[in-house]
Amino acid sequence: MKKVNLDITHRCTLLCAGCTRQDKTHTYKRRDITFDEFHRICNYFDHIEFCGQVSDPIFHPQFSDLLKLAKSKNVSVDVHTAASHKPTDEYKKMFDANSDAHWVFGIDGLPKDSHKYRINQDGEFLFRIMKMAKDQYKINCTWQYIIFDYNEEDVFEAASMAKDLGVSFSTIETQRGKDKTKEYDFKPQCLNGKEIGHSTSGHLLPCCWSDYHKNEIPELVQDHLSLTNNNVSDIVNSKEWKSFYKKLETNPPEYCKKYSGYKKNSI
Protein backbone atom coordinates (compact mmCIF):
# COMPACT_ATOMS: atom_id res chain seq x y z
CA MET A 1 0.00 0.00 0.00
CA LYS A 2 1.31 3.45 -0.94
CA LYS A 3 0.82 5.83 1.99
CA VAL A 4 1.45 9.52 2.57
CA ASN A 5 1.19 11.78 5.60
CA LEU A 6 -0.05 15.22 4.54
CA ASP A 7 0.37 18.64 6.13
CA ILE A 8 -2.44 20.26 4.14
CA THR A 9 -2.53 23.66 5.81
CA HIS A 10 -0.54 25.93 8.09
CA ARG A 11 -3.32 26.63 10.57
CA CYS A 12 -3.79 25.42 14.12
CA THR A 13 -5.32 27.05 17.19
CA LEU A 14 -3.42 25.01 19.78
CA LEU A 15 -0.12 25.79 21.51
CA CYS A 16 1.14 22.29 22.31
CA ALA A 17 4.60 22.55 23.84
CA GLY A 18 6.08 19.68 21.84
CA CYS A 19 4.89 20.95 18.46
CA THR A 20 7.37 22.38 15.98
CA ARG A 21 5.08 25.41 15.66
CA GLN A 22 6.41 26.55 19.03
CA ASP A 23 10.02 26.50 17.79
CA LYS A 24 10.51 30.01 16.46
CA THR A 25 13.60 28.90 14.52
CA HIS A 26 11.47 26.55 12.43
CA THR A 27 10.14 28.17 9.27
CA TYR A 28 7.31 26.77 7.18
CA LYS A 29 5.19 27.95 4.28
CA ARG A 30 1.88 29.50 5.24
CA ARG A 31 -0.18 27.97 2.50
CA ASP A 32 -2.89 25.37 1.89
CA ILE A 33 -2.60 22.36 -0.37
CA THR A 34 -4.40 23.10 -3.63
CA PHE A 35 -7.14 20.96 -5.10
CA ASP A 36 -4.91 20.15 -8.07
CA GLU A 37 -2.10 19.00 -5.77
CA PHE A 38 -4.53 16.83 -3.83
CA HIS A 39 -5.79 15.28 -7.07
CA ARG A 40 -2.21 14.24 -7.81
CA ILE A 41 -1.93 12.73 -4.34
CA CYS A 42 -5.15 10.71 -4.77
CA ASN A 43 -4.06 9.49 -8.20
CA TYR A 44 -0.94 7.86 -6.72
CA PHE A 45 -1.48 6.90 -3.09
CA ASP A 46 -3.82 4.27 -1.63
CA HIS A 47 -3.94 5.74 1.87
CA ILE A 48 -3.69 9.27 3.25
CA GLU A 49 -2.87 10.32 6.80
CA PHE A 50 -4.05 13.83 7.56
CA CYS A 51 -1.65 14.29 10.47
CA GLY A 52 -0.01 17.68 10.19
CA GLN A 53 3.39 18.50 11.61
CA VAL A 54 2.46 22.16 12.07
CA SER A 55 -1.28 22.14 11.46
CA ASP A 56 -4.63 20.56 12.19
CA PRO A 57 -6.32 19.37 8.96
CA ILE A 58 -9.79 20.58 9.94
CA PHE A 59 -8.65 24.15 9.28
CA HIS A 60 -8.09 23.65 5.55
CA PRO A 61 -10.81 25.83 3.97
CA GLN A 62 -11.84 23.00 1.60
CA PHE A 63 -11.32 20.05 3.90
CA SER A 64 -14.79 18.58 3.34
CA ASP A 65 -14.21 18.69 -0.41
CA LEU A 66 -10.85 16.95 0.00
CA LEU A 67 -12.53 14.21 2.03
CA LYS A 68 -15.16 13.79 -0.69
CA LEU A 69 -12.52 13.52 -3.39
CA ALA A 70 -10.57 10.89 -1.47
CA LYS A 71 -13.72 8.81 -1.06
CA SER A 72 -14.58 9.13 -4.76
CA LYS A 73 -11.08 7.85 -5.60
CA ASN A 74 -11.37 4.94 -3.12
CA VAL A 75 -8.44 6.31 -1.14
CA SER A 76 -8.65 5.44 2.56
CA VAL A 77 -7.97 8.26 5.01
CA ASP A 78 -7.10 8.80 8.66
CA VAL A 79 -7.90 12.24 10.09
CA HIS A 80 -5.83 13.24 13.13
CA THR A 81 -7.29 16.19 15.01
CA ALA A 82 -6.85 17.78 18.42
CA ALA A 83 -8.13 21.31 17.88
CA SER A 84 -11.62 22.21 19.03
CA HIS A 85 -12.29 25.56 17.42
CA LYS A 86 -14.84 24.64 14.77
CA PRO A 87 -18.62 24.92 15.11
CA THR A 88 -20.48 21.65 15.52
CA ASP A 89 -22.11 22.11 12.10
CA GLU A 90 -18.67 22.16 10.48
CA TYR A 91 -17.82 18.81 12.02
CA LYS A 92 -21.13 17.43 10.76
CA LYS A 93 -20.22 18.57 7.26
CA MET A 94 -16.85 16.81 7.49
CA PHE A 95 -18.39 13.58 8.80
CA ASP A 96 -20.99 13.65 6.01
CA ALA A 97 -18.28 14.19 3.39
CA ASN A 98 -16.61 10.83 3.96
CA SER A 99 -18.30 8.23 6.13
CA ASP A 100 -15.41 5.82 5.51
CA ALA A 101 -12.81 8.09 7.11
CA HIS A 102 -11.11 7.00 10.33
CA TRP A 103 -10.90 9.87 12.82
CA VAL A 104 -8.24 10.01 15.53
CA PHE A 105 -9.02 12.47 18.33
CA GLY A 106 -6.07 13.71 20.37
CA ILE A 107 -7.37 14.04 23.94
CA ASP A 108 -4.42 13.66 26.29
CA GLY A 109 -5.98 12.88 29.63
CA LEU A 110 -9.53 12.98 30.87
CA PRO A 111 -11.41 15.50 28.69
CA LYS A 112 -11.38 18.08 31.48
CA ASP A 113 -7.57 17.90 31.75
CA SER A 114 -6.38 17.55 28.16
CA HIS A 115 -5.78 21.29 27.82
CA LYS A 116 -2.82 21.01 30.21
CA TYR A 117 -0.75 19.88 27.22
CA ARG A 118 -3.11 20.79 24.38
CA ILE A 119 -3.15 24.46 25.31
CA ASN A 120 -6.32 26.22 24.04
CA GLN A 121 -8.11 22.90 23.54
CA ASP A 122 -11.61 22.36 24.92
CA GLY A 123 -11.25 18.66 25.61
CA GLU A 124 -14.80 18.21 26.83
CA PHE A 125 -16.18 19.74 23.62
CA LEU A 126 -13.92 17.54 21.49
CA PHE A 127 -15.03 14.47 23.44
CA ARG A 128 -18.65 15.37 22.62
CA ILE A 129 -17.71 15.72 18.94
CA MET A 130 -16.10 12.27 19.03
CA LYS A 131 -19.24 10.87 20.63
CA MET A 132 -21.39 12.50 17.95
CA ALA A 133 -19.17 11.08 15.20
CA LYS A 134 -19.56 7.58 16.63
CA ASP A 135 -23.22 7.69 17.66
CA GLN A 136 -24.80 9.73 14.87
CA TYR A 137 -22.49 9.14 11.90
CA LYS A 138 -21.11 5.67 12.71
CA ILE A 139 -17.61 6.99 12.08
CA ASN A 140 -14.69 4.74 12.98
CA CYS A 141 -13.05 6.70 15.83
CA THR A 142 -9.93 6.35 17.96
CA TRP A 143 -9.18 8.23 21.15
CA GLN A 144 -5.44 8.92 21.10
CA TYR A 145 -3.96 9.56 24.53
CA ILE A 146 -0.37 10.76 24.95
CA ILE A 147 0.84 9.84 28.43
CA PHE A 148 2.30 12.62 30.58
CA ASP A 149 2.90 12.95 34.32
CA TYR A 150 -0.39 14.79 34.79
CA ASN A 151 -2.55 12.11 33.14
CA GLU A 152 -0.80 8.77 33.73
CA GLU A 153 -3.06 7.91 36.68
CA ASP A 154 -6.17 8.40 34.53
CA VAL A 155 -5.34 6.02 31.69
CA PHE A 156 -7.58 3.19 32.87
CA GLU A 157 -10.53 5.50 33.50
CA ALA A 158 -10.13 6.99 30.02
CA ALA A 159 -9.87 3.52 28.48
CA SER A 160 -13.11 2.57 30.23
CA MET A 161 -14.79 5.72 28.89
CA ALA A 162 -13.64 4.84 25.38
CA LYS A 163 -14.99 1.30 25.72
CA ASP A 164 -18.36 2.60 26.91
CA LEU A 165 -18.43 4.95 23.93
CA GLY A 166 -17.50 2.20 21.49
CA VAL A 167 -14.32 3.84 20.19
CA SER A 168 -10.78 2.49 20.05
CA PHE A 169 -8.27 3.68 22.64
CA SER A 170 -4.61 4.22 21.82
CA THR A 171 -1.87 5.37 24.19
CA ILE A 172 1.46 6.91 23.22
CA GLU A 173 4.54 7.23 25.39
CA THR A 174 6.21 10.08 23.58
CA GLN A 175 9.92 10.62 23.13
CA ARG A 176 11.62 13.15 20.87
CA GLY A 177 14.65 11.45 19.40
CA LYS A 178 16.78 8.80 21.09
CA ASP A 179 19.00 8.38 24.11
CA LYS A 180 22.51 9.15 22.86
CA THR A 181 24.08 7.00 25.59
CA LYS A 182 22.60 3.82 24.10
CA GLU A 183 23.58 1.92 20.98
CA TYR A 184 21.10 1.80 18.13
CA ASP A 185 20.76 0.05 14.81
CA PHE A 186 20.04 2.39 11.92
CA LYS A 187 16.82 1.28 10.21
CA PRO A 188 15.30 4.11 8.14
CA GLN A 189 11.65 3.27 7.63
CA CYS A 190 11.44 5.21 4.37
CA LEU A 191 13.48 2.47 2.69
CA ASN A 192 10.67 -0.03 3.15
CA GLY A 193 8.13 2.39 1.72
CA LYS A 194 6.17 2.59 4.96
CA GLU A 195 5.01 6.15 4.49
CA ILE A 196 6.07 9.31 2.67
CA GLY A 197 5.85 12.71 4.32
CA HIS A 198 4.71 16.09 3.03
CA SER A 199 5.46 19.73 3.77
CA THR A 200 3.25 22.81 3.70
CA SER A 201 5.59 24.03 0.95
CA GLY A 202 4.04 21.40 -1.33
CA HIS A 203 7.02 19.05 -1.35
CA LEU A 204 6.90 15.33 -0.73
CA LEU A 205 9.51 14.18 1.79
CA PRO A 206 11.00 10.80 2.81
CA CYS A 207 9.23 11.05 6.18
CA CYS A 208 7.26 13.53 8.26
CA TRP A 209 10.32 14.43 10.38
CA SER A 210 12.07 15.70 7.25
CA ASP A 211 9.94 18.85 7.28
CA TYR A 212 11.79 20.04 10.38
CA HIS A 213 15.17 19.31 8.80
CA LYS A 214 14.77 20.57 5.24
CA ASN A 215 18.12 22.36 5.50
CA GLU A 216 19.78 18.93 5.55
CA ILE A 217 18.06 17.79 2.34
CA PRO A 218 18.03 20.86 0.03
CA GLU A 219 18.11 18.62 -3.03
CA LEU A 220 14.59 17.33 -2.24
CA VAL A 221 12.89 20.70 -1.79
CA GLN A 222 13.76 22.27 -5.12
CA ASP A 223 10.94 23.95 -7.04
CA HIS A 224 10.78 21.35 -9.80
CA LEU A 225 10.11 18.66 -7.18
CA SER A 226 7.03 20.32 -5.69
CA LEU A 227 3.52 18.98 -6.30
CA THR A 228 2.70 22.29 -7.93
CA ASN A 229 5.15 21.55 -10.74
CA ASN A 230 5.27 17.77 -10.95
CA ASN A 231 3.31 14.58 -10.40
CA VAL A 232 4.02 12.15 -7.57
CA SER A 233 5.54 9.37 -9.65
CA ASP A 234 8.07 11.67 -11.29
CA ILE A 235 9.02 13.16 -7.92
CA VAL A 236 9.64 9.91 -6.03
CA ASN A 237 11.46 8.41 -9.02
CA SER A 238 13.58 11.48 -9.66
CA LYS A 239 17.37 11.36 -9.65
CA GLU A 240 17.33 13.50 -6.48
CA TRP A 241 15.23 10.99 -4.56
CA LYS A 242 17.24 8.03 -5.82
CA SER A 243 20.44 9.79 -4.78
CA PHE A 244 18.99 10.45 -1.30
CA TYR A 245 18.14 6.79 -0.75
CA LYS A 246 21.61 5.79 -1.88
CA LYS A 247 23.10 8.30 0.56
CA LEU A 248 21.28 6.59 3.43
CA GLU A 249 23.58 3.61 2.95
CA THR A 250 26.82 5.60 3.27
CA ASN A 251 26.28 9.07 4.73
CA PRO A 252 22.76 9.57 6.10
CA PRO A 253 21.66 12.98 7.40
CA GLU A 254 22.01 13.40 11.16
CA TYR A 255 18.25 13.66 11.69
CA CYS A 256 17.80 10.24 10.07
CA LYS A 257 20.12 8.73 12.66
CA LYS A 258 18.15 10.47 15.40
CA TYR A 259 14.67 9.36 14.38
CA SER A 260 15.40 6.02 12.70
CA GLY A 261 17.39 4.34 15.45
CA TYR A 262 16.21 1.12 17.04
CA LYS A 263 17.78 -0.17 20.22
CA LYS A 264 20.01 -3.13 19.46
CA ASN A 265 18.69 -6.54 20.50
CA SER A 266 15.29 -5.04 21.25
CA ILE A 267 12.26 -7.21 20.65
Task: Briefly describe each language-model feature range.
Residues 7, 44-52, 76-80, 99-109, ...:
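Conserved C-terminal portion of the radical SAM core fold
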Residues 128-140, 160, 164-180, 203, ...:
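C-terminal accessory region of radical SAM enzymes
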Residues 1-102, 113-124, 128, 136, ...:
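Conserved alpha-helical substructure of the radical SAM core
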Residues 6, 10-13, 184, 250-253:
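Processing junctions and N-termini across compartments
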Residues 16, 23, 194, 211-212, ...:
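Extracellular/secretory pathway and lumenal proteins
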Residues 15, 27-28, 58-60, 111-115, ...:
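Short catalytic/ligand-binding loop motif for oxyanion handling, primarily in non-cytosolic enzymes
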Residues 66, 74-80, 92, 103, ...:
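Catalytic cores of transferase enzymes with a strong primary signal for eukaryotic protein kinases
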Residues 12, 16-19, 190, 207-208, ...:
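Short cysteine clusters
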